[in-house]
Amino acid sequence: MKLIPAALIAATLATPAAALEPLSQEKYINDRLIAARIADRIRRTCPSIDGRILYAYGEARKLKRYAESKGYSRAEIDAFLDSRPDKQRIYAVAEDYLTRQGAKAAEPESFCRIGRQEIARNTVIGSLLVAK
């Protein structure tokens, strides 16, 4: 009888910890980074919308703490944030979203319209923006 608990403990200790998925595949983190990129494009293109910079900074710190709480190291987080392919992927997804919403590079008002909609719907994107 005492062998069974000992065997279970030994088996548990011998089992490797569950491997974390790559940060590039972590949905919550990627969705927030994509939203931040979209908000940044809107605030830089639309003259009547600003970014909530201090709020965005706080959200970025929360996101980093979230990643750390999931078990990612600071080195892994920094490597992900510095990764050119991951940045390009995030930027591409953000641009695709803006295009599907009707954004046109030559029409700043198209970005303003999207920004106002995001603010009105209180989306993650909208929470990072404020109308001037």
Swiss-Prot record:
Name of this chain's protein: Uncharacterized 14.7 kDa protein in nqo3 5'region
Organism: Paracoccus denitrificans
